[in-house]
Each structure stands twice: as C-alpha cells, then as structure tokens.
C-alpha cells in the first residue's frame, strides 16, 4: 500500500507534548547576557568593566552580565542588566554573537549572548552601586573573568569593522568638531596611526562634512576649522555608500 504525502508528513513529525517532554528531560542550560559598552573620552577608546562578584574570579574585572529571567526576551534582559549595573538606559545595544563553550562558566552550562554599544562618556552618568565600576583603556584590558576576554575581543573587532561601514563615530564628537578630533577618534578605535592628508582626502570625498566657517578656540595647537556632519545628506546616500577603506 502506497503512503500518501500527508501520512508521510504525519509519520515524520512529533507532537508538541513529545517535544516538551524531551526539553524537560534534558539537563538544564542557563542563558545569560553580557554587555560590552565602549566609550570615547580624552582621545581614548575605553570599555566599561565591573569587578566580578564570583569568589572564583575575585579581584578580576568582567563585563556587565547576568542570567536572563524565564519570562524575559533577550533584548529586554540586556537593557535590564545594563540599567541595574550602571544606571544607563538611553543607549542603543546591538546583538553581536552567542558564546557557548562547554566550560565557559564554572557554575555549569551557561550560554551567553553578547550585546555591544558605543557611547560618548561625557553624555552619560554612571550610577556606582556595590561593585566597582570603571572605564578602562582598551589597551590595558587583559585577563578578564570567565571567557570575557574572548567576548571583548570579538566585540572590539566588530566595532572596528562597523565604524568603517557606517559613520558611527560622529555621535561621539561635539556637534562642532575639527578634522584633528575626527582623526583622533578613528585612530583610537582602529588602533592605528593614519596619514593626515590621506585621511582628510577620504572624508572630503564623501561630501558629508559641512564647513561652518569657524575655527577652534583656546586650543594648545594651531586652531583648525570646525565642521559638522551632514546627517541629511548621509540618509539620502547611505544605501549606495560602501563605507571608508582605510
């Protein structure tokens, strides 16, 4: 007797109850969220770290993270954890990657999802609670708790790629900025020195800078012209914009 397509489909499928029973019988796996918050201040790229409250990692720094609640979406958990640990609420978090090495957490099987953000430190005030919370120069970040060094490195590489694909950096600058400040920002994030003439040539070619006809005031170096970013022009051209190749 030949089987119909419908009967074959029924034979190869499982009921919801069967799947539910299987899920309940599997060893529990916890899910957490870790937030990597980058900030720019004093021409340096920094990352926000908190002292680990786990005895095994006593005195080590860690990212901002915690387990998610059973009735909570991933993104909601990320914003809740960030708010609880830092007081920050008006930042944009972008999901980066999932980390699930078997032995990444000493308490058991914990899979974590990393979120990343880039903010202007001067525009955000931190609330310091029981744990130490500090901005650290990214060049001094080593030996973090758990697998947080790997998570940090991954998010940093993602940030370096993103800032060449999108003009994220302008949100970190004053509304009026000099080309010197702009170059300092990109050098800090990309971790490399750039040729001054070539850098300026690339940005002028994009035609997203507006010359304000003003110069810097009270600076210890030769005053430079002040510019602002033309967000309106960028919005019109962003679909065709291929980024900046340094």
Label the model's feature ranges.
Residues 215-246:
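Long, intrinsically disordered, low-complexity Ser/Thr/Pro-rich regulatory/activation regions
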Residues 23-61:
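N-terminal strand-loop-strand
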Residues 184-193:
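Short helix-coil junctions and helix-kink-helix linkers
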Residues 1-9, 40-42, 47-50, 71, ...:
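Core subunits and conserved enzymes of cellular information-processing
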Residues 29-33, 75-79, 83-126, 162-169, ...:
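Active-site segment of metal-dependent pyrophosphate-handling enzymes
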Residues 63-71, 171-172:
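Short histidine-centered catalytic/ligand-binding loop motif
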Residues 116, 125-159, 163, 174-180, ...:
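NUDIX/MutT-family hydrolases
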Residues 2-34:
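Acidic, metal-coordinating catalytic segment for phosphate/diphosphate chemistry
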């Amino acid at each position: 007797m030949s089987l119909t397509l419908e009967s074959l489909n029924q034979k190869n499928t499982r009921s919801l109850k069967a799947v539910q029973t299987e899920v309940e019988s599997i060893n529990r796996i916890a899910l957490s969220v870790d937030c990597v918050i980058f900030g720019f201040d004093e021409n340096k790229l920094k990352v926000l770290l908190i002292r680990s409250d786990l005895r095994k990692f006593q005195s080590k720094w860690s990212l901002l993270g915690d387990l998610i609640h059973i009735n909570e979406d991933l993104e909601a958990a990320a914003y809740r954890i960030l708010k609880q640990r830092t007081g920050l609420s008006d930042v944009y978090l972008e999901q980066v990657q999932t980390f699930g090495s078997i032995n990444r957490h000493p308490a058991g099987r914990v899979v974590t999802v990393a979120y990343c953000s880039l903010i202007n430190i001067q525009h955000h005030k931190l609330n310091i609670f029981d744990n130490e919370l500090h901005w650290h120069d990214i060049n001094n970040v080593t030996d973090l708790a758990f697998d947080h060094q790997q998570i940090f490195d991954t998010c940093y590489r993602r940030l370096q790629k993103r800032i060449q694909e999108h003009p994220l950096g302008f949100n970190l600058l004053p509304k009026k900025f000099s080309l010197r400040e702009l170059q300092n920002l990109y050098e800090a994030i990309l971790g490399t020195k750039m040729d001054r003439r070539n850098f300026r040539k690339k940005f002028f070619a994009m035609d997203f800078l507006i010359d304000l006809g003003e110069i810097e005031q009270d600076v210890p170096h030769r005053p430079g012209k002040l510019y602002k970013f033309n967000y309106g022009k960028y919005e019109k051209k962003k679909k065709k914009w291929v980024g900046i190749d340094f």
